[in-house]
Swiss-Prot record:
This is Macrophage colony-stimulating factor 1. It comes from the Eukaryota. Residues 33-492 are extracellular. Homodimer or heterodimer; disulfide-linked. Likely to exist in multiple forms: homodimer consisting of 2 identical 150-200 kDa proteoglycan subunits, heterodimer consisting of a 150-200 kDa proteoglycan subunit and a truncated 43 kDa subunit, and homodimer consisting of 2 identical 43 kDa subunits. Interacts with CSF1R. Residues 197-207 have a biased composition (Low complexity). Keywords: Cell membrane, Cytokine, Disulfide bond, Glycoprotein, Growth factor, Immunity, Inflammatory response, Innate immunity, Membrane, Proteoglycan, Secreted, Signal, Transmembrane, Transmembrane helix. The gene is Csf1. N-glycosylated. O-glycosylated; contains chondroitin sulfate. It is linked to A defect in Csf1 is the cause of osteopetrosis. Osteopetrotic mice (op/op) are severely deficient in mature macrophages and osteoclasts, display failed tooth eruption, and have a restricted capacity for bone remodeling.
Length: 552
């Protein structure tokens, strides 16, 4: 072989390297083709049928299981949703889906485990810091869980058939947008709860109580006065007075037990407590420190007055007969305010050390209509006895009842003052039956001074604090007086005296009976001894008599 021929030939190593490179390229291409064909056709219809058989073999139950799955509401990208759900489905198949060995369901679960392991090559795993993003805990039934798994495999199969490399997408940005773990984005239940309305609203007093009809005439007052009136802090003497017509005295509007003070419906009562010598404050300034006490006392008294159907009728009739010929534009009747008198007078610290004081009521006085409402006259209290009280209680309707300056009621001032200091809560809407109200009221108002002096201290300690109304509801007469006096309320002192007395009487009777029994038992043996000895004596005497008589 010449040198030229040798120089024109290629070395064998060069041909070997090129062949090896060609073989490597062909092999890599075939491997890539096999991988793509493997991912695209990895999920078959047989796997979906297995899942359907698992669903059909489950028992329908309401029991729920807890599992973690992707929150589709937070992750709207379908590719990233399936990519995140794949690793969660693996955990569910390995840990949650447990069946008895060698059963059809256990064999189906093993096939699903093999499928999920083969799909690992088709899914790329993102950073571990986004492992729990877009995931929340679900509480659903096993049927719903299997339905989720079936839908996952079905959607994954469809996407892999279109693009086998679709799950290599980087979803870190989508995962970063999700909120923290276990955050439910569903709207909360809009449950409508009854909201608390302020107490000044008439509709909030009670669902069964209509609004007070006396709210309409208060429209002409100032705003602050009307607000205080609705809040039950405005005194009755600060409200505009009204003159009653004799013809419309018996036409009463519907009554209400709301907590507002019905100023235009209440009659002008003649039974009022006398005022102190100090002048009243103006209408715009309520007395500080006493407003709460007056509010509680006014609420109790006005509710009791509203419960009686005959109270306002009797007083309206008497008021109409007081000045029937007086013109409307002339003088008006200025009533003295009982709660204001209570606020002006000092309160006692305790009621046990004080005796009841008889305070007379002041008759109505005629004043000039141009005179301010808050100005009143000062009177001196007078003491009366129980006979005058009963005489005024049973006065005929035709007789002048208000024009006479004589006192009309005797009331115990210690008891109402103590009752004003004790209660701290309102008793709106608590109305007793009419018969029980009149019985209790007549017992309190028609009790004699001796009974008041004897039982005031003991009753304050024995009985619970009862509601007090210084204005009588109606005149019930002698029959209701006896019925009211039979109220079984025994003071504690009487009880302490009665029990030892009864025990002493029983011991005395027992001692007498025992003494009588002993005396009889002691007398019976003597009678027996005498009876045994006497028949022998009598027989001997009879024989002697016979012997003496025979010779004769």
């Amino acid at each position: 072989m010449t040198a030229r021929g040798a120089a024109g030939r290629c070395p064998s190593s060069t041909w070997l390297g090129s062949r090896l490179l060609l073989v490597c390229l062909l092999m890599s291409r075939s491997i890539a083709k096999e991988v793509s064909e493997h991912c695209s056709h990895m999920i078959g219809n047989g796997h979906l049928k297995v899942l359907q058989q698992l669903i059909d073999s489950q028992m329908e139950t309401s029991c729920q299981i807890a599992f973690e799955f992707v929150d589709q509401e937070q992750l709207d990208d379908p590719v990233c949703y399936l990519k995140k759900a794949f690793f969660l489905v693996q955990d569910i198949i390995d840990e949650t889906m447990r069946f008895k060995d060698n059963t059809p369901n256990a064999n189906a679960t093993e096939r699903l485990q093999e499928l999920s392991n083969n799909l690992n090559s088709c899914f790329t795993k993102d950073y571990e810091e986004q492992n729990k993003a877009c995931v929340r805990t679900f509480h659903e039934t096993p049927l719903q869980l299997l339905e989720k798994i079936k839908n996952f495999f079905n959607e994954t199969k469809n996407l892999l058939e279109k693009d086998w490399n679709i799950f290599t997408k980087n979803c870190n940005n989508s995962f970063a947008k999700c909120s923290s773990r276990d955050v439910v984005t569903k709207p909360d239940c809009n449950c409508l709860y009854p909201k608390a309305t302020p107490s000044s609203d008439p509709a909030s007093a009670s669902p069964h109580q209509p609004p007070a009809p006396s709210m309409a005439p208060l429209a002409g007052l100032a705003w602050d006065d009307s607000q205080r009136t609705e809040g039950s802090s405005l005194l009755p003497s600060e409200l505009p007075l009204r003159i009653e017509d004799p013809g419309s005295a018996k036409q009463r509007p519907p009554r209400s037990t709301c907590q507002t003070l019905e100023s235009t419906e209440q009659p002008n009562h003649g039974d009022r407590l006398t005022e102190d010598s100090q002048p009243h404050p103006s209408a715009g300034g309520p007395v500080p420190g006493v407003e709460d006490i007056l509010e509680s006392s006014l609420g109790t008294n006005w509710v009791l007055e509203e419960a009686s159907g005959e109270a306002s009728e009797g007083f309206l009739t008497q008021e109409a007969k007081f000045s029937p010929s007086t013109p409307v534009g002339g003088s008006i009747q200025a009533e003295t305010d009982r709660p204001r008198a209570l606020s002006a007078s000092p309160f006692p610290k305790s009621t046990e050390d004080q005796k009841p004081v008889d305070i007379t009521d002041r008759p109505l006085t005629e004043v000039n209509p141009m005179r301010p409402i808050g100005q009143t006259q000062n009177n001196t209290p007078e003491k009366t006895d129980g006979t005058s009280t009963l005489r005024e209680d049973h006065q005929e309707p035709g007789s002048p009842h208000i024009a006479t300056p004589n006192p009309q009621r005797v009331s115990n001032s210690a008891t109402p003052v103590a009752q004003l200091l004790l209660p701290k809560s309102h008793s709106w809407g608590i109305v007793l039956p009419l018969g029980e109200l009149e019985g209790k009221r007549s017992t309190r108002d028609r009790r004699s001074p001796a009974e008041l002096e004897g039982g005031s201290a003991s009753e304050g300690a024995a009985r619970p604090v009862a509601r007090f109304n210084s204005i009588p509801l109606t005149d019930t007469g002698h029959v209701e007086q006896h019925e009211g006096s039979s109220d079984p309320q025994i003071p504690e002192s009487v009880f302490h005296l009665l029990v030892p007395g009864i025990i002493l009487v029983l011991l005395t009777v027992g001692g007498l009976l025992f003494y009588k029994w002993k005396w009889r038992s002691h007398r019976d043996p003597q009678t027996l001894d005498s009876s045994v000895g006497r028949p022998e004596d009598s027989s001997l005497t009879q024989d002697e008599d016979r012997q003496v008589e025979l010779p004769v």
